[in-house]
Amino acid sequence: MQVLKTPESAFIKITDFPYPPRFTEITDTVSGEIRMAHYQCGPKDGHTVLLIHGEPTWAYLYRKMMPVLADAGFNVIAPDLIGFGRSDKPVRKEDYSYARHVIWLKDWFSQATKGPVTLFCQDWGGLLGLRLVADMPERFSGVMVSNTGLPTGDHVPSDAFIKWRRFSQDVAVFPTSTIIQNATTTVLDEATLAAYDAPFPDESFKAGARMFPILVPTSPDNAEAQANRQAWEKLKQYNKPFVTAFGDSDPVTKGGEKVFQKLVPGCNGMAHTQIENGGHFIQEDQGERLANLLVQFIQNTQLK
């Protein structure tokens, strides 16, 4: 499998993400070894908080949340998914599948984290992170979800999603930072936009970003739709603290929190929040507020 590595020089102008990358060699039965990056801050002996990004971002998305969590005494870990950030980027679209992303993330998680973990996830961070919670519930002491879901293909996708999926495949130049800007309520400055473009020096680096939209299960007979149904059966038994914090300005996932609140027993009695002026990339719009909510959630439910 041919893999690209974004040169470190691509990241040199980023001044607001001071965390050095740490690399983990992970394997699967098809690709052999592949390298996944993550970033750490806060006391390493603190309670671990795992922050998983989605499409088409990288751990830089969490730069507003990480210092707040670290100052609260948590061991903060934010990975770059394969195909994103400083992680390796397989060249062929065929090298990416939902199942393989789960395998990659699970291998990395088993190596890079220890003890009980609180998960925060958004977008594809939920499609992947919640599969880990379902498969390894003993490793997770709590979960906060924002602007995400775990689709089973049993509902017709929206016209907006169908257009987005088609766009992701047909557009000649995949406009990473423009996609992010169009899904926030705040205006991002040039340095921030450049930081989101940094992992992708040219189109050959973007196979993973182009693939995520078509890996979302949109029909009931999709293999990963069945895997997600099985994951939901396990989440229906998850009775540890589970809270939702969705944005009020994200048309993609609006109302999705109700599914979690209805089906996951750990949601009962939790202080669920709708975040004002929170677009799809809510970490950009309301990062500090989200981080403070996450601190309160952990302190009130998991560290008593």
PLM-predicted stretches and their roles:
Residues 46-53:
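Short beta-strand element of the alpha/beta-hydrolase
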Residues 54-57, 123:
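Active-site glycine-rich loops that stabilize anionic/oxyanionic intermediates
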Residues 64-68:
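Typically the conserved alpha-helix immediately C-terminal to a functionally engaged Cys/Sec
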